Amino acid sequence: MFSEELKAFRRLGIRHLLLQALNFASVIASGLMMWKGLGVITNTESPIVVVLSGSMEPAFYRGDLLFLTNPSGVRFHTGDITVYKVPNGDIPIVHRVLETHEIAPNATFVPHKYNRAYTPEDQLLLTKGDNNPIDDTGLYTQGMDWLERKHIVGKVRGFVPYVGYATIAMNDFPQLKYGLLGILGLMALIQRE
């Protein structure tokens, strides 16, 4: 089945193999640069995330691909769908803002006014999954009742349904991920262009 490919692989010189490996590395590096560039444009460490659970049904289903932004200086409102990571949490969580609260440590006086102007960083959020019966305080770190702005990864701006199932499959079955990477690497090495 792969006899022709193996013969072609043996006929290639070391110089050609190194060139193909360099081309493969440049494709990987280009992908990483695009990911980081998208992160800079959207002001978030993860501009694209996959929904991993059914906690946001019927708004989003497991496997939906979400596009995020996190503009600084913009306040969150009740009903906004956010993605957040709690301290010592590995997986970002996609849930809706249930309630907002203001704190005043960074507040400044507005001239000729008796009230304070709050910055978006002074905002605290309480979230809940649409399909969950209670709010997320049980998911937060112990002693944490509200999310701070530093915990927010981004606000959902759009989605593509079910495209993220490929990512879920590769995480659930690591052999699939390594097999696909191996096939891609082999194809890059034996490609004759």
Curated annotation (Swiss-Prot):
The keyword Glycoprotein applies. GO terms for molecular function: serine-type endopeptidase activity. SUPFAM superfamilies: LexA/Signal peptidase. GO terms for cellular component: signal peptidase complex. Its EC number is 3.4.21.89. It comes from the Eukaryota. It is a single-pass type II membrane protein. Residues 1-16 are cytoplasmic. Residues 42-193 are lumenal. InterPro entries: LexA/Signal_pep-like_sf, Pept_S26A_signal_pept_1_Ser-AS, Peptidase_S26, Peptidase_S26B. It catalyses: Cleavage of hydrophobic, N-terminal signal or leader sequences from secreted and periplasmic proteins. GO terms for biological process: signal peptide processing. The chain crosses the membrane at residues 17-41. Keywords: Endoplasmic reticulum, Glycoprotein, Hydrolase, Membrane, Protease, Signal-anchor, Transmembrane, Transmembrane helix. It is an enzyme of class 3 (hydrolase). CDD domains: S26_SPase_I (cd06530). Residues 179-190 are annotated as: C-terminal short (CTS) helix. Glycans are attached at residue 106. PROSITE patterns: SPASE_I_1, SPASE_I_3. The C-terminal short (CTS) helix is essential for catalytic activity. It may be accommodated as a transmembrane helix in the thinned membrane environment of the complex, similarly to the signal peptide in the complex substrates. Catalytic component of the signal peptidase complex (SPC) which catalyzes the cleavage of N-terminal signal sequences from nascent proteins as they are translocated into the lumen of the endoplasmic reticulum. Specifically cleaves N-terminal signal peptides that contain a hydrophobic alpha-helix (h-region) shorter than 18-20 amino acids. Component of the signal peptidase complex (SPC) composed of a catalytic subunit SEC11 and three accessory subunits SPC1, SPC2 and SPC3. The complex induces a local thinning of the ER membrane which is used to measure the length of the signal peptide (SP) h-region of protein substrates. This ensures the selectivity of the complex towards h-regions shorter than 18-20 amino acids. SPC associates with the translocon complex. Belongs to the peptidase S26B family. NCBIfam families: sigpep_I_arch (TIGR02228). This is Signal peptidase complex catalytic subunit SEC11. It comes from Schizophyllum commune (strain H4-8 / FGSC 9210) (Split gill fungus). The lineage of its organism: Eukaryota, Fungi, Dikarya, Basidiomycota, Agaricomycotina. The gene is SEC11.
